[in-house]
């Protein structure tokens, strides 16, 4: 609930593992709010969330990530002057110890792992490229890789086609099918049927 507004009322969703689930509704219908609750950005006033048969109180995006839930927001959350790899590992950096004592970020390992994930799901990105040099569809792929790098199994896409060209939409749909074929559960939020 927001002051004077009930964003979601009497909502029940049952989504099975490996399913592509579309949540369709007009702008302002509460779709993104509902997914923001599932991702821990908002706490529900009432009701319950059950993930893999267990009742959960998802209090933050970090906790959602621990539950293997990831979200690609309509407005990307990327640092423009960082590389793709730096954006993806931000907050979960792989570390090594110099001389066995001093921790530092192992970007070689990160680049290798990201390149492998990219290839596995048909995302086709170069982890060493700087985000400010990327087009919108490639930035979206970086957001998808951020989820995959954190082992997300439930992937929420908020209005994923809103800023894409028809060709980019076709490419995204293939990526989503690859993700589903890889055992991921997909939730698409959209107000468009095409």
Where are these regions (language model features)?
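Glycine-rich phosphate-binding loops of nucleotide-dependent enzymes
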Residues: 1-194
């Amino acid at each position: 609930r927001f002051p004077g507004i009930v964003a979601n009322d009497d909502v029940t969703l049952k989504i099975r593992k490996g399913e592509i689930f579309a949540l369709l509704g007009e702008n302002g219908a509460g779709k993104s709010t509902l997914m923001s609750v599932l991702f821990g950005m908002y706490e529900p006033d009432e009701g319950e969330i059950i993930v893999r048969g267990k009742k959960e109180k998802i209090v933050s995006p970090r906790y959602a990530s621990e539950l293997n839930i990831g979200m690609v927001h309509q407005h990307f959350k990327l640092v423009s002057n960082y590389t793709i790899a730096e954006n993806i590992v931000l907050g979960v950096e792989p570390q090594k110890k110099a001389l066995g004592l001093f921790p530092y970020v192992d970007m070689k390992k990160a680049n290798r792992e990201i390149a492998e994930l990219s290839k596995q799901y048909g995302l086709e990105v170069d982890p060493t490229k700087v985000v400010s040099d990327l087009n919108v569809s490639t930035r979206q792929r970086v957001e998808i890789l951020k989820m995959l790098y954190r082992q997300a199994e439930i992937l929420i896409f908020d209005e994923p086609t809103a800023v894409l060209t028809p060709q980019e939409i076709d490419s995204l749909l293939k990526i989503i099918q690859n993700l589903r074929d890889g055992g991921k559960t997909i939730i698409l939020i959209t107000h468009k049927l095409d």
